[in-house]
């Protein structure tokens, strides 16, 4: 009888595991990626910490540092992120619930957002107070210094990270006649150059708010995630001085993807895994083998580079984490290789006829490119080349103050007119990985973002009215707009130059019956005769 019970229990466990794991086949080309190609290569060993006996967890995580991130025997922690105050202290806003809750991990919907503080970025973080009820928080600071802590279905706001009183509110969302992709949960935010905010929702839609609190306006009509099979969730977006970054997790396949963007709307996906189980490792090579790594969040340096990633981790299947058992969850901190600061010095656009490319590697505290870089190891160009060990090779170097200028032979760069941040991969003289993305002097990193609403039939004027708004940070370039209704073009009309956030309405004369609410529309934008954007309704 005991044997039968064991077999039934084992069968249930394996079925539960299979229900949460699907082996995703990697593209064959990923086998040829070099070190530095994958975002996953940026994870560094966790700082040395305290290891003790008699703690919760499966055997695979008993070697963990209990003082890393936040961990308490009686609390199951989950997602959260860290802000730093002007005194240098680190503030983690993280959700959690009593470990002995009747539903175990499934009590997550009743979680509380805690405010924890530490003098060290990696922790240990100690709870100082609670903010309120809520799950999967993400904290960000507004231009006026107030702090917003987003939670599913709402947010809390206070004057600062140390505030004792937090006020609850709800964001307003304007889908702008677009379908909301998979609802509005697990939102993630990035501050733009003008202190407005870009938001990505769980479904992969992109939204913009002028100040982080005003209505979020949807720009996209489809997800911006990689066009591959996956059960995507847990996006995290951030912006550094050069570009936007986005990581999204396929929770079923337990693989995450890394993307980059110049404007936060149009993305490229780099090859290789952003992270997989096992990225939490120690200096001696020992690995904390957590079953799941979810809710990634980044801490950024003064240049906006990600220097640490925090994860919600659990040692078993969520449904197997029961009250008063040996399983639980916590939030861990893993340092990241932040990358080099690079800039291309060629003033003219790089083309197939370009002979050499000059790249400046900036000196920083603790990094002297003139003495630390193994110049011969460097490769530079499009990520499509460099990630596979190809790209430009260095031919000589020059000194510029404390910085180093590396001159590359341009052949094989792979750089096209669409390139906005070419990549460098190499090693330092100790064999450690070096990488970075370079600013191009001829690229506009604050581009216009023209976006239309659904065309409306105007009975009085007998045509189509189309509202267009510039959500970008620069004035729009000369543009023509074409409306296609049920597959038939309604001709092109010139659009005047729109300043950031400016709205213009265009009227398209038509002798067709266009008042059908079920009609399908496309609004297409052309610049210099080339299609640059298409909105579908």
Question: Where are the regions that the model predicts?
Answer:
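Carbohydrate-active catalytic/glycan-binding domains of CAZyme proteins
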Residues: 20-343
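Intrinsically disordered, low-complexity Pro/Gly/Ser/Thr-rich segments with frequent PxxP/GP/PP motifs
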Residues: 488-516, 525
């Amino acid at each position: 009888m005991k044997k039968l019970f064991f077999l039934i229990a084992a069968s249930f466990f394996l079925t539960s595991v299979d229900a949460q794991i699907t082996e995703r086949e990697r593209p064959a080309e990923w086998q040829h990626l070099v070190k530095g190609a994958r975002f996953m290569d940026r994870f560094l060993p966790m700082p040395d910490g305290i290891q003790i006996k008699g703690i919760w967890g499966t055997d695979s995580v008993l070697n963990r540092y209990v003082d890393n991130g936040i961990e308490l025997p009686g609390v199951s922690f989950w997602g959260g992120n860290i802000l730093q105050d002007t005194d240098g202290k680190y503030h983690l806003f993280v959700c959690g619930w009593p470990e002995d809750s009747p539903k175990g991990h499934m009590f997550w919907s009743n979680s509380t957002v805690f405010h924890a503080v530490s003098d060290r970025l990696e922790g240990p973080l100690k709870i100082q107070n609670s903010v309120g009820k809520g799950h999967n928080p993400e904290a960000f600071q507004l231009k006026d210094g107030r702090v917003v802590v987003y939670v599913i279905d709402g947010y809390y706001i206070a004057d600062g990270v140390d505030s004792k009183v937090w006020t609850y509110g709800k964001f307003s969302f304007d889908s702008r006649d677009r379908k909301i992709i998979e609802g509005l949960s697990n939102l993630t935010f990035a501050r733009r150059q003008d202190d407005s905010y870009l938001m990505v929702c769980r479904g992969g839609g992109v939204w913009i708010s002028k100040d982080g609190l005003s209505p979020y306006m949807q720009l996209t009509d489809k997800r911006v995630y990689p066009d591959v099979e996956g059960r995507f969730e847990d996006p995290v977006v951030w912006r550094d001085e050069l570009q936007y970054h986005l990581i999204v997790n396929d929770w079923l396949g337990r693989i995450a993807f890394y993307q980059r963007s110049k404007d936060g709307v149009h993305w490229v996906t780099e090859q290789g895994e952003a992270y997989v189980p096992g990225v939490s490792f120690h200096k001696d090579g020992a690995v904390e083998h957590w079953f799941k790594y979810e809710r990634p969040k980044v801490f950024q340096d003064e240049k906006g580079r990600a220097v640490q990633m925090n994860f919600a981790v659990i040692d078993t299947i969520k449904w197997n984490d029961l009250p008063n058992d040996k399983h639980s969850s916590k939030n861990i901190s893993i340092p990241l290789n932040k990358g080099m600061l690079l800039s291309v010095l060629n003033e003219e656009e790089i083309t197939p006829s370009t002979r050499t490319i000059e790249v400046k590697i900036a000196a920083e505290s603790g990094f002297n490119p003139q003495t630390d870089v193994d110049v011969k190891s460097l490769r530079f160009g499009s990520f499509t080349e460099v990630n596979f060990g190809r790209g430009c090779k260095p031919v000589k170097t020059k000194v510029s103050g404390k910085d180093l200028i590396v001159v590359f032979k341009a052949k094989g760069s792979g750089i096209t007119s669409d390139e906005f941040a070419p990549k460098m991969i190499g090693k330092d003289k100790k064999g450690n990985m070096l990488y970075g993305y370079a600013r191009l002097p001829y690229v506009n990193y604050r581009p216009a973002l023209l976006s239309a609403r659904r065309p409306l039939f105007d009975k009085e004027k007998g045509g189509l009215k189309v509202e267009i708004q510039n959500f970008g940070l620069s004035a729009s370039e000369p543009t023509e707009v074409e409306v296609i209704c049920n597959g038939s073009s309604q001709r092109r009309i010139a659009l005047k130059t729109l300043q950031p956030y400016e709205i213009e309405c265009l009227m398209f004369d038509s002798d067709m019956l266009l008042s059908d609410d079920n009609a399908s529309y496309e609004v297409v934008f052309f610049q210099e005769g080339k299609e640059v954007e298409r909105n579908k309704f």
